[in-house]
Every structure is written in structure tokens, then in C-alpha cells.
């Protein structure tokens, strides 16, 4: 019995010590450093409106359906962050073909003057997470005609807005040139006022 206690005592102490270190101390230190060094990112990269209300995050896409606004990528999870993921259909899967065809049909309804051959792939396919907040500058540009027609904003103004909101690859190496759809639509709202 004494031998069992002598073996269990250090096991319990080590377990408790690591529980406190890994479950409490380490997360608090990392959170403190993140808040001090990069507060915006640590808080979720939130985007605020003119009234200082949170309206979204630059990291999570939103579903814009109003034809006067720029639309983002298709989301098989309807932009529900708790359900992040995609169907990940293989290119040979008939369900993928049906879903892309449906996206193309919706595109044609809203953008009848833009040939389907000019539609960038990111407007009719899912991202891996289903929550991608960004589109390519070309994906934004092909929507300019529709938005200009519905809002009476000159195409040149919309082209400049896209140019102003375009972000390059991180460190010039990682990722693609992209436009955040939420930021783009906030800029569009300011122009419409």
C-alpha cells in the first residue's frame, strides 16, 4: 500500500502541475502577448461601422445577396462559422458539376451582360473553409457593370474602389492578390451615401 502511494503521489503532482501550466499559465501568457503585440488580430480582426459597431471580421466571409453589392465566393455551409468546411467534391463528382452549374445559372440571372467565359472560377466554386472573405480582383471587376447599372455609380469609381481595396500577397510571397468583400462593400456604401 505504501508503495502504491509513493508511485501515485508524483504522478498526481506532475499531472496537476502540467494541468495548471498548460491549461492556465501558458494560455494566459500567449493571450497577454497577443493582446500587447497585435491586439487587432487577437480580437478576431473585427471590422466596425461608423457607429463603432462590430459588423464582421475581415477573416470570415459574409453572404451578400443584394445585387447592388459585390458578392463573394459560393459557400456550401451558407457562411455559418460553426460549420466551417466544404463538401470537397472530386472534380469528377457529378454533384460538384451540378453545384457549379447552379452557381453559373445564378450568375447569369444577375449578370446577363457578362459572358460566362469571363467569370473567374472563384465566383462559382467553394473555398476549402466555405468562409473565404476574399475574392480575386478580377472577380470583383466582373461585377462592376451590374453594380454601376443598379447604383448609378460610374464604372471608373468602382474600378478605383477595387484597386484601393486590393491587397497583395503576404510578404510578397504567400497567397494571392485579393479583395476583401466586406471591406469592398463598406467602401461602396460610403460612395452611395
Swiss-Prot record:
User: What is the protein's membrane topology class?
Assistant: Single-pass membrane protein
User: Where is it predominantly found?
Assistant: membrane
User: Which Pfam families would you find in this protein's record?
Assistant: KdpC
Q: Which UniProt keywords are listed?
A: ATP-binding, Cell membrane, Ion transport, Membrane, Nucleotide-binding, Potassium, Potassium transport, Transmembrane, Transmembrane helix, Transport
Query: Which cellular component terms (GO) are annotated to the entry?
Result: plasma membrane
A single GO molecular function term of this UniProt record = ATP binding
**Its function?**
Part of the high-affinity ATP-driven potassium transport (or Kdp) system, which catalyzes the hydrolysis of ATP coupled with the electrogenic transport of potassium into the cytoplasm. This subunit acts as a catalytic chaperone that increases the ATP-binding affinity of the ATP-hydrolyzing subunit KdpB by the formation of a transient KdpB/KdpC/ATP ternary complex.
What's the protein here called? Answer: Potassium-transporting ATPase KdpC subunit
The gene it comes from is: kdpC
Amino acid at each position: 500500500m505504501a508503495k502504491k502511494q509513493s508511485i501515485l503521489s508524483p504522478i498526481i503532482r506532475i499531472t496537476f502541475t502540467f494541468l495548471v501550466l498548460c491549461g492556465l499559465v501558458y494560455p494566459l501568457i500567449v493571450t497577454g502577448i497577443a493582446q500587447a503585440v497585435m491586439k487587432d488580430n487577437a480580437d478576431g480582426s473585427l471590422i466596425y461601422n461608423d457607429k463603432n459597431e462590430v459588423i464582421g471580421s475581415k477573416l470570415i466571409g459574409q453572404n451578400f445577396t443584394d445585387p447592388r453589392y459585390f458578392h463573394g465566393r459560393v459557400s456550401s455551409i451558407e457562411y455559418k462559422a460553426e460549420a466551417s468546411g466544404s463538401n470537397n467534391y472530386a472534380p469528377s463528382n457529378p454533384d460538384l458539376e451540378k453545384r457549379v452549374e447552379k452557381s453559373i445559372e445564378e450568375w447569369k440571372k444577375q449578370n446577363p451582360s457578362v459572358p460566362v467565359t469571363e467569370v473567374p472560377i472563384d465566383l462559382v466554386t467553394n473555398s476549402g473553409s466555405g468562409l473565404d472573405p476574399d475574392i480575386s480582383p478580377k472577380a470583383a471587376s466582373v461585377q462592376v457593370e451590374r453594380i454601376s447599372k443598379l447604383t448609378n455609380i460610374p464604372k471608373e469609381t468602382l474600378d478605383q474602389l477595387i484597386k484601393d481595396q486590393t491587397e497583395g500577397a503576404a510578404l510578397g510571397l504567400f497567397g494571392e492578390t485579393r479583395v476583401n468583400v466586406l471591406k469592398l462593400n463598406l467602401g461602396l456604401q460610403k460612395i452611395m451615401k
